[in-house]
């Protein structure tokens, strides 16, 4: 995964109270799971579990025998009831087979998405499911327009194309969510406390900061200063055999 994900430990204590969109995405994803694939699964894996925001929904909504959680480090504040797989999901070995794999607001950090889904395909049991959310190309577009810094997001159709090579598409959905802040400074604080962008890697001078705040005035509305999120939702099933070259 991209190196910015390594900095999550700095914001972990503040994440859940500030990750308003990610929480909404988690709840919506679980609704789609309940509607489309049910809640009975033996072996469950969550990729990029972070502080356990989505994990709590799994524990509440899914009937499982074993729960495996993955992230670069263990930020979970509660103990017991899971096996932790520490490391970059693109690099670690997945020796178990899973009935369902979840991930909420993590795959935007992946370097090679197609290689990852090949790996996850092989790690699913027959008829297993991959259910995840991520972000699209218009995510945080206001900040990127000003700074020219941001992640290189895949488009919705690119995700569908990659997924369709290996899985049956069960459900897919995308939308836009808007947050409003009292000032451009509050926009930056929000991004810092949720770790959602790579802007923090840039060395800002005082002039850069002033220029950012002045430029952000173009996104001022009656509700406040606009920040756009672009969530994607996917549920896919492993119901066909794929031949690898």
Swiss-Prot record:
Keyword Methyltransferase in record: yes
Keyword Protein biosynthesis belongs to the record: no
Transmembrane intervals: none
Pathway the protein acts in: Cofactor biosynthesis; biotin biosynthesis
Top EC group: transferase
GO terms (BP aspect): biotin biosynthetic process; methylation
Pfam families linked to this entry: Methyltransf_11
Top-rank taxon, per record: Bacteria
Keywords carried by this UniProt record: Biotin biosynthesis, Methyltransferase, S-adenosyl-L-methionine, Transferase
GO terms of molecular function: carboxyl-O-methyltransferase activity; malonyl-CoA methyltransferase activity; S-adenosylmethionine-dependent methyltransferase activity
The protein's Enzyme Commission number: 2.1.1.197
Cited function: Converts the free carboxyl group of a malonyl-thioester to its methyl ester by transfer of a methyl group from S-adenosyl-L-methionine (SAM). It allows to synthesize pimeloyl-ACP via the fatty acid synthetic pathway.
Protein family per UniProt: Belongs to the methyltransferase superfamily.
Name of this chain's protein: Malonyl-[acyl-carrier protein] O-methyltransferase
Gene that specifies this protein: bioC
């Amino acid at each position: 995964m991209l190196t910015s994900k390594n900095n999550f430990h700095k914001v972990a204590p503040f994440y859940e109270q500030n990750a308003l969109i990610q929480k909404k995405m988690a709840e919506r994803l679980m609704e789609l799971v309940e509607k489309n694939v049910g809640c009975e699964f033996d072996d469950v894996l969550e990729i990029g579990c972070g502080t356990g925001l989505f994990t709590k929904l799994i524990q509440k909504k899914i009937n499982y025998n074993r729960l495996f959680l993955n992230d670069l480090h263990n930020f979970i504040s509660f103990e017991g009831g899971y096996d932790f797989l520490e490391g970059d999901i693109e690099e670690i070995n997945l020796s178990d087979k899973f009935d369902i794999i979840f991930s909420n607001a993590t795959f935007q950090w992946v370097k090679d998405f197609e290689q990852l889904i090949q790996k996850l395909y092989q790690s699913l049991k027959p008829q297993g499911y991959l259910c995840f959310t991520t972000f699209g190309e218009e995510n945080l577009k206001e900040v990127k327009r000003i700074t020219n810094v941001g992640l290189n997001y895949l488009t919705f159709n690119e995700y569908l194309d990659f997924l369709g090579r290996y899985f049956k598409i069960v459900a897919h959905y995308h939308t836009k969510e808007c947050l409003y802040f009292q000032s451009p400074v509050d926009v930056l604080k929000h991004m810092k406390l949720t770790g959602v962008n790579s802007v923090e890697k840039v060395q800002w001078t005082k002039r850069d900061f002033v220029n950012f705040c002045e430029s952000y005035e173009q996104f001022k509305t009656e509700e406040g200063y606009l920040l756009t999120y672009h969530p994607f939702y996917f549920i896919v099933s492993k119901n066909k055999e794929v031949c690898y070259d």
